[in-house]
Each structure stands twice: as C-alpha cells, then as structure tokens.
Amino acid sequence: MTRSFRLLEASGTFERRDILSSQIDRPRSFLNVEFAQKPDVTALQSWVSVVIGKNGVGKSRLLAGIADIFETLGRGRKRDDELGVSRLAYASDDRLCEIETDSIFRLRGKVDGRRCELTELPLPTKVIALTTTPFDKFRISRSLLGFPRQQHPDLPERYTYLGLRDRFGRASPTAVIFRAIEGLFNASRAEASRRLRIAEVFGFLGYKPHIQVRYEFNTPSMERLKRIVAGDLLKRVEAPGTNSGLWRLEKMLEQDPSLLSQVRSIAEDALHRANGTRFFSLRADFEGYSEDDRFFQKVQLLRRAGLLGMRAAEVERVIDGAVLDLKLASSGELGIVTGFLGLASVIEDGSLIFIDEPEISLHPEWQTRYIDLLLKTFGNFGGCHFALATHSPLILSDIAPENSNVVSLDPNRREAEDAEAFAGRSADYLLVAAFQVPGKNNLYIKQEIIKALRLAANGKAATNEFANILESLVVLLPQMEEDSPVAELIRELQEAAEASMAIQ
C-alpha cells in the first residue's frame, strides 16, 4: 500500500471527449502544469497545492481530468478515449512514476524512467473528489451509478465522488448528506485503528463520535409494506383505480423480479424496528459498537423504492449535547461537516484528494481557517496530497509555507510557486499578487503608490526600488478602468520615471 503520494506534473486538454463534443470543431486548451517538486525522501507529511486562475482557464477540468486517469486505471482499463490527459508525473513513496497516453488513447506507464505494465504502477491509495458546487466536472463514482466492479469486486473502490450530484446527475444537498452517511456506516465496521482515526475527526469538529439516521414511513407506505410482508401480490396492494404508490418498486422488479423477496424480508425487519410507530433509527458508532451498518445497506432498497424516507441525520455536540440535524444545517455547516465526515470515511494514508471551490457558502472566518482546519482534522493521515481549486484570497492566505505551494494557471506561470510569498498576506495583496485583480479600492495598491510617490518626491525615481514598485503597478493597468484615479496616478508615476531617465 502507498504510504506517501505527491502529484508532480500534469499535461493535457483536461476535457472529456463524448460523442457530441468530438464532432464539434472547437479549440481545446492545452495545459502543462507543475504541481510540486519531487520530495528528496518519502514524504509522510501531507501536502497542499492551491490551484488558482481566472474563470474558464480549466481549474475544474484539470482536477477532474487527473481524477479520470486514476479512476480509469483503478478499474483495470488500459485505454480510454474520453481522457484529454497526455501525461502525469507523481511520486509514490520513493518512486518517480509517469503515465502517458498515445495517439490512440492507450495508457503507458513508467517507474523510475523504465517502462512497466500498468498493473505495476503504484497508485494513490484513494482518489477522492470533494466539492459543494453543482457545476463540478468530476466523474460520479461507478458504485453510485450502479455499475458492477469488473475486476476484483471484493476490493474497495479506489475513486470516490463526494459532491452534490446524484446518480442521475441532479444536484441535491440530500445527496451529499447521504453520501457522507453511507461512507460512515461502511467505515463503522472497519478495524479498530481506522475507527479511532474517524472518531478523532468527529472530535476535532466538536462532535461525539457517532451519527444517527432517523427513518420514517408515511402512512400509505407503511400499510403497503404490511401487505407486502403478509404476502399479498403487488396488484392487490393498491386499491383499483388509484394511482400506484409502488411504481418505483414495480420498475425495479421489471429489471430483477427476485428483489421482491428481499423487499419482504427487509420490510419485515424495518417494521419490527419501528415497533408500531412510523419511525426507526440506525447508528454508526466509532467509539462504542453497533451492528446497524449491515441493515443500513439493506434498507436502502426500501428507500430507492420510495417506501421509506430519511427524516433526519443527527450529530451531537460534545460541549453541550446539542443535536444538529444535517438536513437542517446551513449551507456552510453542511459543506464543512458533511465534506469532512465524508472524507474521513474514505481517506487513507497516501491518498490524492481534489477539493473544488471549497469557499462556496463559507463565512469569511471559515475561509481564513479552512486549510488549517483541513490539515489538523486529517493530521493523523500521512502522505496525502490535497489539491484545492479556489477563487478565494482568504483560503489562499491560510496556506502553511512548510507543506504547501501555489499553482497558477496563468499562461506565464504554471509552475509550483513557494507558499512563502502568499501565506498570511492580506486579501488586498493576494488579489493583486496572486489573482491579478486590482479592483477599484485596493488598499495594497494605494500603499504601493504612496511608497512610489515618496521615493519620487525624495529624488529617487531612478532607483531600483522605485522601478520595482512601478513595474508591479504598471502590469495591473490593463485590468483597471481607463479613467480611474488609481490608473491616472500610476501613469503619472510612469511619466516621472521617464523624465528622471531623460535627465540622466
């Protein structure tokens, strides 16, 4: 198993070729991006790369394209004509690995410069896509789509999608809640060491190490289930001439008639748990012990058939015992809690985690702490690489120089940049230095203009210090309104510099 993973480089168009798009003659943007330098030794400390760039430059496509490569390899496939990736380079433990695609979309592998079979390539332990935007570009996990595992069906899926879209592609907050819950129930039967790690994530978020899901039958569904359990035929369960409330179940049985016996067995157990009421609860516990995980998987058959609904998904605060229903949480709380708990349920040492636009719905205070919270929450998982695509200067300012870097998709950059220049800096500075967005009332620009004016007033317009400040200001002029006072001041400083040079 991989103990340490570091993504180094990625090249390609990072767009999928479906049948329609392949018939349309349109330019495809090619990116060659450096994510990080190869560590000198096996890096057991996790790493963060913050990916920045303007809308439309390909941040989301970049992350999704890389995830697609590893998802394809994780399925044991050797080619995929939907991939726009031409090359990936990464470090797995102490080995340098490369993946390339040829002209007919076959994948080729190298380890330490030598050709190898794709099955010999060490891959990240897990590849996880976490997002709270309904417009993400990530591929939905095959398990969510209901596809069977082609090879090694007994092994857990390498790629996991933790986003808003359900298996039909529809965006729904309920989908992301259920996905986190499903992962937690699966993990609740893991070995003790893994359950302890997940319990620590709950604790760091301020919650007790368990989650409780409350299910509810509506009255018609409950009566239908009682009759199904009693052995009635489906056509006799509904009164003649009424709209069938069993249409979902009927469609499922058209595909697999044997499901009816499973529905009867599961419904009997669920009704027994409800004990004459319309409600029952299941619990995933990472400190104590619960056997509810297996029934949780079974009861999803009733949920998909429309015979059962999830009423609440509850976590309990440590400080006061207050219960938070995730279905009623704010969008910011939902993003943090379900995102981090969902991630906790699948992350392992040596994972590659993509996070797209984490700032969505987050209060500025949470944005300023996001990366720190991420690393502390998952500090007991080593050798992971987190790649975040963001437009937020507040998130960027939270990076730690010792284990982070910045990746800009600006055409003139696209190299891994030292985090030292961005860590802890003001939002106004980062809007200029990182995002090249001066705005109309940027305090940092005003301070730089004041410095330049003082130098000019002191007869130092010909100095290197003045020239450096002026150069950093002039490059911002194309992004400013022509008649803005700030732009006029910068042009006047240019004229002062030219006059000073003429005198010399």
Predicted features along the sequence, with ranges:
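Switch/communication elements of ASCE P-loop NTPase nucleotide-binding domains
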Residues: 1-76, 309-444
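A structural signal for short, well-ordered beta-strand segments and their strand-loop junctions
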Residues: 128-131, 211-216, 354, 388, ...
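A short hydrophobic beta-strand->loop->alpha-helix junction that borders the nucleotide-binding pocket
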Residues: 131-134, 163
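FAD-dinucleotide binding site
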Residues: 50-60, 90-91, 99, 116, ...
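Acidic, Mg2+-coordinating catalytic modules of nucleic-acid enzymes
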Residues: 2-17, 40-45, 136-139, 145-158, ...
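Extended helical coiled-coil dimerization/tether regions that scaffold
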Residues: 2-28, 164-334, 341-348
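Conserved P-loop NTP-binding catalytic core
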Residues: 44, 64-129
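Short glycine-/polar-rich loops that comprise or flank the Walker A/P-loop
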Residues: 122-126, 156-158, 402-404
